[in-house]
């Protein structure tokens, strides 16, 4: 079942918190700490290794939170289709698949029997042109991102994961009705760490992002809930005030 239409998000659902923790106990602490400031959570590989991944997924759903399963599936089409078929039984809003192979994305969309929205990972925000060249791809990241976004669109995916630096180019290439979710968001007071292609909240939405993923800028804040609320305010301003 192709779910090509983008996920309809409320303004406060456009800030996705990266729940990168090693245990269910810590996950529950963060859910409680952030309260109503966060309505959408991304759960990834570190939590999967704890063996408590699906308990946390249920915990989030029970709290009325949206869930983003970020496991970046990349395998032969039949295997990825099987995983998506099983995940369709869970209350998942977003799920990621690597955007490197069109038949794999096609198989995933055909196996999706729920309202789960599939996002293609284009080029990780930790990667530069030099990193791509080492992999035999001697091209600018934006060119690779656009190529993979177009392939994802053709395969029936709901959208892509991409840096805010490439969001405007994706929107021009693919048009509306296709979700662009941007990680690598950084504020002035937070180091970039391993992120290379970063962007501010306001700039990401100005470039056409539908949602952003934020982890360390919230986790490292003196008051994480207040930091998240400040980001919610910035998002609301970016989406409601006319650009100059």
Swiss-Prot record:
GO annotation, cellular component aspect: cytosol
Gene Ontology BP annotations: 'de novo' pyrimidine nucleobase biosynthetic process; 'de novo' UMP biosynthetic process
Keyword entries, A-Z: Decarboxylase, Lyase, Pyrimidine biosynthesis
Keyword Kinase included in the entry's annotation: no
EC number(s) per entry: 4.1.1.23
Binding site for substrate: 20, 42, 70-79, 125, 186, 195, 215-216
Catalytic residues, chain numbering: 72
Pathway: Pyrimidine metabolism; UMP biosynthesis via de novo pathway; UMP from orotate: step 2/2
PROSITE patterns tied to this protein: OMPDECASE
Catalytic reactions on record: orotidine 5'-phosphate + H(+) = UMP + CO2
UniProt GO molecular function: orotidine-5'-phosphate decarboxylase activity
Family, similarity comment: Belongs to the OMP decarboxylase family. Type 1 subfamily.
NCBIfam families linked: PRK00230.1 (NF001273), pyrF (TIGR01740)
Its biological purpose: Catalyzes the decarboxylation of orotidine 5'-monophosphate (OMP) to uridine 5'-monophosphate (UMP).
Subunit structure comment from the entry: Homodimer.
The name this protein goes by in its record: Orotidine 5'-phosphate decarboxylase
Gene source species: Xylella fastidiosa (strain 9a5c)
Lineage, highest ranks first: Bacteria, Pseudomonadati, Pseudomonadota, Gammaproteobacteria, Lysobacterales
Gene: pyrF
């Amino acid at each position: 079942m192709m779910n090509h239409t983008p996920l309809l998000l409320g303004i406060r659902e456009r800030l996705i918190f990266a729940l990168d923790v090693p245990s269910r106990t810590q996950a529950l602490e963060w859910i409680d700490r952030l309260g109503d400031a966060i309505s959408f959570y991304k759960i990834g590989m570190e939590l999967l290794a704890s063996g408590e991944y699906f308990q946390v997924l249920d915990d989030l759903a029970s709290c009325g939170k949206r869930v983003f399963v970020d496991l970046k599936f990349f395998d032969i089409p039949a295997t990825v289709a099987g995983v998506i078929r099983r995940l369709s039984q869970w209350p998942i809003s977003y799920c990621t698949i690597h955007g490197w192979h069109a038949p794999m994305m096609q198989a995933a969309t055909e196996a999706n029997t729920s309202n789960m929205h599939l996002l293609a990972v284009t080029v990780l925000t930790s990667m530069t042109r030099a990193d791509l060249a080492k992999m035999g791809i001697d091209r600018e990241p934006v060119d690779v991102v656009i190529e993979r976004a177009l392939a994802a669109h053709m395969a029936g995916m709901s959208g892509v994961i991409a840096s805010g630096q490439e969001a405007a180019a994706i929107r021009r290439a693919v048009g509306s009705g296709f979700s662009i979710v941007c990680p690598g968001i950084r504020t002035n007071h937070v180091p970039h760490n391993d992120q290379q292609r970063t962007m501010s909240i306001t700039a990401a939405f100005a470039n056409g992002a539908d949602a952003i993923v934020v982890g360390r800028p919230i986790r490292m804040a003196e008051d994480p809930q207040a930091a998240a609320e400040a980001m919610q305010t910035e998002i609301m301003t970016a989406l409601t005030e006319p650009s100059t």
